[in-house]
Each structure stands twice: as C-alpha cells, then as structure tokens.
Amino acid sequence: MFFEFLQQGFFHILDIGALDHLLFLLVLGIVYDLSQWKKLLWVLTAFTIAHSLSLALSILNIININAKLVEVLIPLTILITCIENFIYLTPKKYNIILAGIFGLIHGLGFSNTLKELFIGMDINLFQTLLPFNIGIELAQILFMSILIFLLHYFNKLKLIAYCNLVRIISAFVAVQSMVWIVTRFNNI
C-alpha cells in the first residue's frame, strides 16, 4: 500500500490535471539558478511540509474550508509569485515563508481530490498520506531539477537575458492564473 500511494502522489503532480501546481512550481523556481539548488530544495521542502500539514488536517476533517474558495486561492498564489518575480527577479529570504503559506493553500486543494480517493478507506497517516506526500516531494524535486538544468543551459546560449526570460515566463503564467481566478471565482 505504501508504494501505491507513493506512486499516486508522484504521478498526481506530474499529471496535466495538476497544471496549476506545475505552473506554481515553475514560477517559484525560475528565479533560482543552478548554484542555488540547495536554497530551492529548502523552499520546496517548506512548501511540501505545509502542504502535507493542511492536507492531513483536511483529510482527517480537523479543518474544513470551502473547496471552491480554495480553488480560487490556488491561482492567486501563482499570480502573487509571478508579480514577485517581476519585481525582484531573484530569490528573497522570505521565499521560504511564502512557499510555506502557499503550501497550506495548495494542500487544502489536494485534500478534495484525496477525499474522493479515500472514500470508504481507513485513513492511516503512515500508509496513505505519508507515502502520498513523499511521492509529491519526489515529483517536485524531479520537475524542478529538470527545470533548473534546462534553464541553466538555455541561459548559456545567451539567446535572451535571463531576467527577461523570467519576466516572459512569469507573464504567461500570470495571464493563465488570472484566467483560472476568474473562471473559478464564477463557480463559487
């Protein structure tokens, strides 16, 4: 059972249905270069710990938040990260705090999916939630590793200044996040 939930967590992140999560990771990580991989790993870990905490609290029905509201807040976290990228272009020390706060919101979003998955199951934190979250962390590390290496080599080509690349990618992601905000807000 452990390995099954580890796989589900891993592939849940890499699924096209989790595009909002992948775009969040993209704009969260794009400001880090290859030499800052340890800092990025800490940011991802803060995100995952917070994500895991809110996910567990929601799955165990300790907290309940309107799922439709959470679905609006998720793209809002993406938009805020894009705006942050436009303003600063480099990672800031408080990125780890923002990642943690945003992880709480994203975890609540995943909890709705998992509640459907766990219908009729006895929820055991160590057999279900822990491996699911480890799978999420592994997928995030894989995604961000590939991203950082691709961006590093793209930057070496000197086709465009890296700060402009950050702005262009952040702009496209910001537009998509605004579309999600409007669409999801209309569903509340």
Regions found by a protein language model. Name each.
Residues 21, 51, 79, 104-106, ...:
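Divalent metal-coordination and catalytic microenvironments
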Residues 11-21, 65-74, 134-140:
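Structural signature of hydrophobic alpha-helical transmembrane segments
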Residues 1-19, 91, 118, 178-188:
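Histidine-/acidic- and/or cysteine-rich, low-complexity loops and terminal segments associated
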Residues 57-68, 86-90, 114, 186-188:
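Membrane-interface helix caps and helix-loop-helix hairpins in membrane proteins
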Residues 9-58:
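Juxtamembrane transmembrane-helix termini in multi-pass membrane transport proteins
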Residues 27, 166-184:
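Final/C-terminal transmembrane alpha-helix of multipass membrane proteins
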Residues 62-66, 86-90, 149-168:
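Membrane interface segments of multi-pass transport proteins and intramembrane proteases
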Residues 1-16, 93-105, 128-135:
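Small-residue-enriched transmembrane helix starts and helix-helix packing motifs
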